[in-house]
Every structure is written in C-alpha cells, then in structure tokens.
Design a protein with these regions (language model features):
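N-terminal leader/capping segments at the start of a protein or of a new domain
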Residues: 1-46
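Unchanged
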Residues: 104-192
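Conserved beta-strand and immediately adjacent loop positions that scaffold enzyme active sites
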Residues: 78, 87, 174
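Acidic surface patches and DE-rich sequence motifs
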Residues: 6, 83, 92, 141-142
Length: 204
C-alpha cells in the first residue's frame, strides 16, 4: 500500500482486498496506465469534504510509479531523534508540530540529508544515525506545478545535553524534546504523515 498526502487528505494505492472496502468514506478511482492523475488532484482542490481516494490495483507498485511520474518528484529526509531520557525531538512550524526534515542536495546521500537537516533545523549536532523508519509521500503546488515529495525518515539518537536552536529562517518558532507520555497533544496538532512516522516506528 502507498499513501500520498495532500495536507490532511490522501490518495491510497492498495490491492482490491485492502481497506477501501471497509472504509465508509471510501471513494474509488480505477486507474490504468493511460489514466491522468489531474482529475483526482482537482477533486481534492474543489471538495473540502473529500478525505480519501482509493486506487485499487493488482499491481500496486507499478500503479504507484505511474502516479508518481505525473508529478515533479523531489526527495527529502528527516529524523525521529531520541535523547537518553527517551524524549523525541520535535519542531513547531507554521503553527503545527513537525519533525525536522528538508530537501536533498545534488549528489548527497539521502541519509546524509537526514542528519544535516535535523542538525540545521534544531541546532543538535553529533547525532547517531539509526535505521530507516519509512518513506512518506506528500504533494504540494509551487509555481503552479504539482510536486510529489518523497521523505525518508530515520531513527536517530543523541546522548549529550544541548540548547536547542530553532532555524527561524525556515519559519521554525520552537524546537523541543517531548516525553513519550506527552506526545498525544503534539500528535493531535500535526500532519497525518508525521503521525504515520511515529506509528511506523512503533512509538504510538
């Protein structure tokens, strides 16, 4: 299954046997290699009540690649950093809680992108890189072009005390270590893709 987010809503590419049949809000779109994704994007833009569109397919990976190719694809990476107390590093940007992340630079390994972006956005250095958690997909429009951002998320650990320094030029107003027991209100005020990272990491 692949989930492509449009802010808080999503297009879900899955097998016919998956969740579409049990979701009471399911809207199905039957996709072929000649299908155009733009009608789905336009549906999201014009209908604020539409939450999820399912694309059932017996060839999920092939269908996913066909969909991806209809956007301008960009790569990004970030991290779910944990300190020795078991707190998680989060940032506040545009009024919502988020995880530090950013775009991949030319020729840069994606894991290096993840470490660099977390350090730049929070001031935390000497992070230890762990395993890949998941990859999330998010669509956005820029200069009248639809982009599809693939974000690689990694486990990270930090063992030193540090004063957090939010990167204000990236509209980050706060960086904070959040205890696991305190996560629920933070995850309520974040993006669905960020909740997906915590779920994939088996934190919540």
């Amino acid at each position: 299954m692949h989930k492509i987010y449009f802010d808080r809503r999503s297009i879900i590419i899955c097998t016919p046997e998956e969740a579409a049949l049990t979701d009471p809000n399911a809207v199905e779109f039957h996709f072929t290699d000649k299908s155009d994704i733009r009608p789905l994007v336009e549906m999201f833009e014009t209908s604020t009540t539409l939450e999820r569109i399912y694309i059932p397919s017996d060839a999920v990976e092939e269908c996913y690649r066909i969909v991806c190719c209809q956007f301008k694809e960009v790569n990004a990476a970030g991290g779910l950093a944990c300190n020795r107390r078991g707190d998680f590093l989060m940032i506040r940007r545009d009024g919502l809680w988020d995880l530090p992340k950013g775009h991949q630079e030319a020729g840069e390994d994606i894991s290096v992108t993840a470490l660099r972006e977390v350090e730049e956005e929070t001031g935390v250095e000497d992070l230890q890189l762990g395993d890949l958690i998941c990859v999330t997909d998010h669509c956005y429009r820029r200069n009248n072009i639809w982009h599809l951002k693939h974000t690689w998320w990694y486990h990270m650990s930090y063992l030193k005390p540090v004063d957090l320094i939010p990167q204000t030029e990236e509209d980050i107003t706060k960086a904070a270590w959040v205890a696991k027991s305190s996560l629920p209100p933070y995850l309520k005020n974040t993006y669905p893709s960020i909740r997906e990272v915590f779920l994939a990491a088996k934190i919540v």
